[in-house]
Amino acid sequence: MELKLLNENGQEGAVVNASDVVFGRDYNEALIHQVVIAYQANARQGNRAQKDREQVKHTTKKPWRQKGTGRARAGMSSSPLWRGGGRIFPNSPEENFSHKVNKKMHRAGLCSIFSQLAREGRLSVVEDIILEAPKTKLLADKFKTMGLDSVLIITDTVDENLYLASRNLPHVAIVEPRYADPLSLIYFKKVLVTKAAVAQIEELLS
């Protein structure tokens, strides 16, 4: 598979030969969907909570007598039928949202995403991205020259200047190959991969 190599002006020049095993896979929508859903589910904190009728702080006094009033019988104001009462099936922090995806499936899903990005022209290779100083303006000007506004940068090692300069830019993220997740790969409009990172990705996913 040939990947486009961009220069500092965002123009396509030479090409980089990449592994077909990683960047030449067929598009598998069902597998990608499963991998993304599992990633989102496993990222949930699971801290939502509601109260049932036992946990709601209400008096247990019977609101009115059982018979003779003409009203519906009622036992206590914490009943789920009442406003301010407890929930019948409340959400609990103990709920388990985790989804298990085998390593082989996870790798295949990432390969399918990388391959589709390459086919759509959303994945490009750069020699390296180096900044002389940790200045956001320097990086913003570089992206403007290259015509980028939403970009995920995958680099073999995260340069400190590059990391500090990118923190205040919206829709920009920098990760190492081992931390590239399926959701970010799909979310960003453009994915830039350094030459050294391409080799690392092939080693991780082959």
UniProtKB/Swiss-Prot annotation:
Which family is annotated?
Belongs to the universal ribosomal protein uL4 family.
**Compositionally skewed regions (Basic residues) per UniProt:** 58-70
Q: Which HAMAP family match?
A: Ribosomal_uL4_B
Organism lineage = Bacteria, Pseudomonadati, Pseudomonadota, Betaproteobacteria, Burkholderiales
State if Ribosomal protein is listed as a keyword.
yes
An example of a Gene Ontology cellular component annotation for this protein is: ribonucleoprotein complex
Please explain the role this protein plays, according to its UniProt record.
Answer: One of the primary rRNA binding proteins, this protein initially binds near the 5'-end of the 23S rRNA. It is important during the early stages of 50S assembly. It makes multiple contacts with different domains of the 23S rRNA in the assembled 50S subunit and ribosome.
What InterPro entries does the annotation carry?
Ribosomal_uL4, Ribosomal_uL4-like, Ribosomal_uL4_dom_sf
Region annotation (Disordered) ranges: 46-78
Q: Which GO terms describe its biological process?
A: translation
Q: How does this protein assemble?
A: Part of the 50S ribosomal subunit.
A GO MF annotation of the entry reads: structural constituent of ribosome
The protein's name? Large ribosomal subunit protein uL4
Keyword set, alphabetical order = Ribonucleoprotein, Ribosomal protein, RNA-binding, rRNA-binding
